């Protein structure tokens, strides 16, 4: 079994490779087409080889009143004026103490700008980390598949709270060489959100990370004479030019957005309706909100987002680049300079795929191609249900 060395960069876009001479020296490069969503969408696609319409993960939060971690707190809907940031922090902290620990990357996040009366309607999609057994309920991940075949692997850089790449990866030394070694580099996304990926701060970081990858590659190369090597990212980044206050937009129409069950996140606003009148009202209000549109069945089909129920919304409003909502469940977005989660059709949404071996023809590959490509390198069978392709030109 030929060993495989891989590096994952969160949010690295193709244009940024000009600042990374080592990675850019590999001639076999493709643009990575993103999923329409954020990390909670992208990671299951790349680890399972199937699109969201199969793995069923699109947003961090879903409509699930029965299993909501806040189901016990329905009485708090009567707080009225006492429903403020302080009471929300308290309820969130208290609930996390009551429940078993959620080890997912996002855990159970605070819904900062969401009234407490709506918290019991929602549950988090993920309950464990990407590499833990059974992360996805319907499909095995790459980590699950390798465990099933008794193939060992090593993950470096994914441990939350253990420091950044220069701590976890920089201090790593190769001992036993496993069939798969996976380095996870997450700071490009953070720097891009904070400064923009074309900023001096992020460019300096990219150069440092390029040197780090080069050092690890050369250390591995000294130990292993023949191995497959590939690098990928899940999406790109797009500079923000404006912020949209959807709360103010509803007020201009004489309504409060919280008259309706909703979640506002980055560039998406999702709604659940209790009757037809609510749907009519929301559709009317959103009808003149510039810069976005309501996702239709055509979008759901095109981007593999067809779901079996309304867990992600009865209506999903998408705000296109280069804008984001200014007041969301995550905060106020004042420090955000760049964003992702836009249509995969936009070139700025693209990630990267780089390898040391020739790739199949075409300009783009997809996140669902990562799993079958990895399994093929390891000599393991690719399951029939997988949506992706093996990317090696000489495959088979």
Task: Identify the meaning behind each predicted range.
Residues 3-5, 178-182, 228, 314:
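Residue-level preference for the first positions of well-ordered beta-strands
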Residues 4-9, 14, 19, 208-248, ...:
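Metal-dependent active-site segment of extracytoplasmic phospho-/sulfohydrolases and closely related
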Residues 14-17, 54-57, 67-68, 162-164, ...:
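Short catalytic/ligand-binding loop motif for oxyanion handling, primarily in non-cytosolic enzymes
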Residues 14-61:
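Short, structured active-site-proximal loop/turn typified by the sulfatase FGly-forming signature C/S-X-P-X-R
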Residues 32-33, 53-59, 154, 261, ...:
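Acidic/polar loop patches that form or flank catalytic/metal-binding clefts of enzymes
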Residues 50-196, 205-208, 273, 280-281, ...:
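His/Asp/Glu-rich, glycine-adjacent segments
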Residues 226, 235-274, 396:
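Acidic/histidine-rich catalytic neighborhood
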Residues 260-377:
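Active-site neighborhoods of enzymes that stabilize oxyanions during catalysis
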